[in-house]
Amino acid sequence: METRNVEISALRTLRDGFLYLLVAVIMGIVAAFGFIVAVPHGPSAFAGVVGTVATLLIMLLVAVGMALYAIFGKIRPGMRQLSEVDNGFRICYTGTTLMLVGLVIVVLGIIVLAAVFAAAGFSPEALRGTVVSGLDLALGVLLIGGIIAFIGHIMTFVVGAFKLHGKYQNSLYMAAGILFVVDIVLLLVGIYGILTSVGYILMYIALGDTINRLTTATATPAQV
C-alpha cells in the first residue's frame, strides 16, 4: 500500500508538471505573436507600443519561470519518486539532472559572453586577441551546455513517455513520445514546439487516466 501511494503521488506530481508546461507554452506563444504584432512600423508608432512590449516581455519571463518550475519543481521530483517504485525510471530522473547541469552551464556561458562584450566596449574593433578567445570560449560553453540539456530533455521526456507506456500500457504515452521525437526532428529545420505542446496534452490526459485506475484499484478491496 505504501508503494502504491508513492506511485500515485509521483504520477500526480508529473501531471501537475505537464499542466504547468502546457500553460507556459501557451503564454510563450501568445507573447511571441504579441511581439510580432506589436513591432512598430515607424518612429511615431514606437512610443505607442512600449507599454505593450513591456507587458509581453513580462509574460514571456513568467512563461520561462513557469516552465523551469514545471521541470525542476514537478517533473524532476515526480521522476525521482517514480524511480523509487520502478528503478527503470532512474534514467528519466538523471535526465532532469542533465537538464539542470546544462542550464547552469548555459547561464555561465551567457555571463562569459556578456563579460566579453563588456570588455570590448561593444566595439567590433576591440574583438581581437584575448577578447576573441573569450568569445570562442563563451560560445563553446553555450554549445556544451545546450547539448547536455538537450540530451537530458530526450532522457526525461522521450524515454519517460515510452517507459510510462511500457509500465501502464496507455497508448497516449506512446503517441506523446512519438510526437516528442518528431518535434526534435523538426527542430533541425527550424520548426519546434507545436507537436511537443500536443504531447504535453496527451501526457496530462494519460497520467490522469493512470492515476484514476491506480486509485480505483487501491480503493477496491481484494477479493478472497
Name each model-derived stretch:
Residues M1-F122, L127, F150-I184, Y192-V224:
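Membrane-interface extramembranous regions at the lipid-water interface
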Residues T130-D136:
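Helix-boundary and loop/linker segments of multi-pass membrane transporters
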Residues D136-H153:
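Extracellular-loop-to-transmembrane junctions of the mid-late helices
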